[in-house]
């Protein structure tokens, strides 16, 4: 796991958490805007960083490393954390664990889907072959590319922005293994996020 810091370190700290199978670089286009208000720390999960050879094991394992980083560098407290999709689950989990403090948790487009272990294994096993080939090569399946080509320019720009988060159209991500993809999907499904999380001093924003 790596943490990519940028901006003015005297400003409040915000941690940014990518979505499922997404790269830390998916936040690159908004960093300049955020630097007006925050010192940014973009989280790059184990198994999904091009600059190290690791494998994603579980959300709990990743949370422990994130908590250690926040305790070591930021005194155990940060101003904000934003996560989309899987990243939103990480923000929720970090808040409910209460091992560090986040003033504002911002959750975007997180379905908070959960499943039992058997169903999670089946779902993850079904997803891996499709996702692995697409992410590994950086090329959409032909039927998806044809559908994309038929959309209008506004939608196409939106879809391409979404696909770029997975490295699609950027040469692919050959360092990401099938096991990392499986473990990330499986762990997200079986890791329970509490309902009605209420931590004094923390405000949770959901959109």
Give the ranges of each region predicted by the language model.
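Helix-loop "lid/cap" segments that line or gate small-molecule binding pockets
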Residues: 139-164, 183-189
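Active-site loop/oxyanion-hole signature of alpha/beta-hydrolase fold enzymes
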Residues: 41-82
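Conserved serine/cysteine hydrolase catalytic core
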Residues: 176-207
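Flexible "cap/lid" loop of the alpha/beta hydrolase fold
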Residues: 96, 102-136
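Active-site signature of alpha/beta-hydrolase-fold catalytic machinery across serine-
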Residues: 29, 93-97
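Structural beta-sheet core signal
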Residues: 16, 81, 107, 205-206
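Conserved HGGG/HGGXW glycine-rich cap/lid loop of the alpha/beta-hydrolase fold
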Residues: 4-52
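Gly/Ala-rich beta-loop-alpha elbow adjacent to hydrolase catalytic centers
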Residues: 82-91
